[in-house]
Swiss-Prot record:
UniProt feature, compositional bias: Acidic residues: 392-424
GO molecular function: calcium ion binding; collagen binding; extracellular matrix binding; glycosaminoglycan binding; metalloendopeptidase inhibitor activity
Modification Phosphoserine occurs at: 72
Any single biological process term in GO: positive regulation of cell-substrate adhesion
Domain Kazal-like: 130-182
Gene name in the database record: SPOCK2
Region (Disordered): 387-424
Protein name (Swiss-Prot/TrEMBL): Testican-2
GO CC terms of this entry: extracellular matrix; extracellular space
Domain Thyroglobulin type-1: 310-376
SUPFAM superfamilies for this protein: EF-hand, Kazal-type serine protease inhibitors, Thyroglobulin type-1 domain
UniProt organism field: Homo sapiens (Human)
Length: 424
């Protein structure tokens, strides 16, 4: 007689236990979320699960579309179960609260944010599981040729860029082929015998300009996505130590890279800008930023590295190219620069045939202008400080001579005092 009663009691208890477990899972998911962590910015930082066994570092600049949100249907199969094309891959994929599952064919599933699905283009080839009716065109992994988008992010193909534009409802275009940042007219990186060429001052200056433009694109894109406010902690400390000239995309990028929030960038943090394959001068550039040679870059060193003035001769050449190129006036003097962007010792005007000697800053040495080639090595060689016209003196000898002269003067004054007397 008790068996039916027990059955009626067990069923409600089981339902209550199942409800408690479901509530616990929901709380665990909520606690596991990372609220406002700027290192989880979907636009250009990948998640911690993207460590590579080969690369041995966290590639924060990985293609945003090719991230861990894409799951393989084959990985979810158990044992030797045969592939069933009638099954839905989204059946075994659990997305977070704010995402919905999209089936791409019968082997792949993708969890997409609901916000990104608000303005999608409807595609009948891809099925959406949720209350959204539109979807963006999928991309095939075989068609890979990286491009740099107008938002400053690198995409594995043009299709990926178009897909991201569709997902985010943004107008994106290809800035250049290959990864970001887009190169300008790059000088040759190797000599005729195949040996690598050292990075000159002009190479480092050009690289700094490209990186600064790239950082600005990333910063603007972050503002549009509303993720700039999530870095208020590190940025507030940064603002206290940086000058006004560095409170822009340069300072913002520093706070992004400074994961330890100690206002220093060590080699591990700098390695997040993984461009060694495409920018041969990237490591020499960051090494040049470390003016104290302590193995890390401070906030002041970082700002100075990007806002330092270009060498004078190189800056003059660029000014001539910008201002004088359109006028096309004949007889314009073009200075001769060395490999580091400073003036060569001898400068010549091709139109008049006159030559003269200058210092590194381009200041003409008096009396050196002549019709021909002056011997600037002998003229400038007299000066220890190049181009100053003043020879160095031995400070110790100079101090010894001055001390001797002072001693003689004191002896002379004492003698004059002893010889003094009265005439009666």
């Amino acid at each position: 007689m008790r068996a039916p009663g027990c059955g009626r009691l067990v069923l409600p208890l089981l339902l209550l236990a199942a409800a408690a477990l479901a509530e616990g899972d929901a709380k665990g998911l909520k606690e596991g979320e990372t609220p406002g962590n700027f290192m989880e910015d979907e636009q250009w930082l990948s998640s911690i699960s993207q460590y590579s066994g080969k690369i041995k570092h966290w590639n924060r600049f990985r293609d945003e579309v090719e991230d861990d949100y894409i799951k393989s249907w084959e990985d979810n199969q158990q044992g030797d179960e045969a592939l069933d094309t009638t099954k839905d891959p989204c059946q075994k994929v659990k997305c977070s609260r704010h995402k919905v599952c999209i089936a791409q064919g019968y082997q792949r599933a993708m969890c997409i944010s609901r916000k990104k699905l608000e303005h999608r283009i409807k595609q009948p080839t891809v099925k959406l599981h949720g209350n959204k009716d539109s979807i963006c065109k999928p991309c095939h992994m075989a068609q890979l040729a990286s491009v740099c988008g107008s938002d400053g992010h690198t995409y594995s193909s043009v299709c990926k860029l178009e897909q991201q534009a569709c997902l985010s409802s943004k107008q994106l275009a290809v800035r250049c082929e290959g990864p970001c940042p887009c190169p300008t007219e790059q000088a040759a990186t190797s000599t005729a015998d195949g040996k690598p060429e050292t990075c000159t001052g002009q190479d480092l200056a050009d690289l700094g300009d490209r990186l600064r433009d790239w950082f600005q694109l990333l910063h603007e894109n972050s503002k549009q996505n509303g993720s700039a406010s999530s870095v208020a902690g590190p940025a507030s400390g940064l603002d206290k130590s940086l000058g006004a000239s560095c409170k822009d995309s340069i300072g913002w990028m520093f706070s992004k890279l400074d994961t330890s929030a100690d206002l220093f960038l060590d080699q591990t943090e700098l390695a997040a800008i993984n461009l060694d394959k495409y920018e041969v001068c990237i490591r020499p550039f960051f090494n040049s930023c470390d003016t104290y040679k302590d193995g890390r870059v401070s906030t002041a060193e970082w700002c100075f590295c990007f806002w330092r003035e270009k060498p004078p001769c190189l800056a003059e050449l660029e000014r001539i190219q910008i201002q004088e190129a359109a006028k096309k006036k004949p007889g314009i003097f073009i200075p001769s620069c060395d490999e580091d962007g400073y003036y060569r010792k001898m400068q010549c005007d091709q139109s008049s045939g006159d030559c003269w000697c200058v210092d590194q800053l381009g200041l003409e040495l008096t009396g050196t202008r002549t019709h021909g080639s002056p011997d600037c090595d002998d003229i400038v060689g007299f000066s220890g400080d190049f181009g100053s016209g003043v020879g160095w003196e031995d400070e110790e000898e100079k101090e010894t001579e001055e001390a001797g002269e002072e001693a003689e003067e004191e002896e002379g004054e004492a003698g004059e005092a002893d010889d003094g007397g009265y005439i009666w």
